[in-house]
């Protein structure tokens, strides 16, 4: 048994006309905005799960930083501190036929790709409490509670940031983006 499909100008024209009409006027912008909204939701969901678009879990925090963060903000996720998260600053922008999804956070790229942060040498004052017998405690205190200050110089150093990809398309995202585009091309936008 043989099946035959013939595509002629008569059969393809109505479908092409529908697709062209769907993208005329605001159609393309609306399609890109719908795709952008979906990608924002998917990216936030992945950030909450602390995983890359391919589903791999983010690398754990370095032991020293984990101790610090657990002491300061126990139970707060990897890319979250002071109740702000990289994911809280995700945005989408449609300009012409282009959709941009990302963040305006200056630290977004270093978390996405990893890398090295150079910290310059610096001098600062540290504050202690000196007892009446002249001994100085070994714990830092606030300037207000201090009666002994010492100037220290910290050398330059590097911080190695492990990549924790948060932006990108999973296989599920690709399928959903195609579905949204198909709906718009068929003249059935979701919005």
Regions found by a protein language model. Give the residues of each.
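Short, Lys/Arg-rich flexible segments
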Residues: 1-191
